[in-house]
Amino acid sequence: MKFNLWRQYGALNSSPVFDAFHAGANALGHDVVVNGDNGIDVIWSVLWNGRMSPNRIIWEKNVSQSKPTIVLEVGGIKRGTTWKVGLNGINRTAYFGEQDNDRTRADSLGLVCKPWRSNGDFILICGQHDKSLQWQDMPSMSNWFMQTYREIRKHTDRPIVFRPHPRCRLPHIELGLKHVYRQEP
């Protein structure tokens, strides 16, 4: 199999992840090229903004040709240590392989799922970048945040902590809102 890495359209923190993918594919006997014109394209994220915006052209070409795309992204479990790789997307729309995995990997990372809780010191709202494919068909992030805030306030006065996406910060959106505090990512 042949993989085309589109490194120049990756985020500034993407180099080690591209390097690891490249080394892993080579170790498994696959060919890897940079900016190739055949094989399976490997892009960074589905955020069509800044350095990563040219990935959209690659993505849309592959979708129109029913060609797979591998998407790399920083990890959500241990940021800077773990990373994600998905086929034809990342997060909700991607294929990540087998679904019936045992706990071996989670245990090696020291991960324990905590039960859902309906109480606590605050409610956490995590933002997304509204130029991301992951946010497709959603309102603007600022509109979504305000709708979510109003809905929460119908049910509770507990403090709300807003953690914005690092590249879609919505500066000062919390100002003037009752018990809303910002937590920078």
State where each predicted segment sits:
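Catalytic donor nucleotide-activated moiety binding site of glycosyltransferases and closely related
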Residues: 7-10, 146-184
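N-terminal pre-catalytic "stem/leader" segment of glycosyltransferase-like enzymes
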Residues: 1-49, 132
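Nucleotide-activated sugar donor-binding and catalytic core shared by glycosyltransferases
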Residues: 25, 35-38, 111-143, 170-180
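A nucleotide-sugar donor-handling region in carbohydrate enzymes
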Residues: 67-138
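Active-site regions of enzymes building and remodeling cell-envelope glycoconjugates
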Residues: 26, 31, 39-43, 55-59, ...
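Well-ordered, non-membrane alpha-helical segments in soluble/globular domains
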Residues: 14-21, 53-58, 139-151
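Short, solvent-exposed loop/turn segments at secondary-structure junctions
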Residues: 10-11, 46-49, 75-78, 128-132, ...
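A short, gly/pro- and small-residue-rich
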Residues: 49-77, 143-147
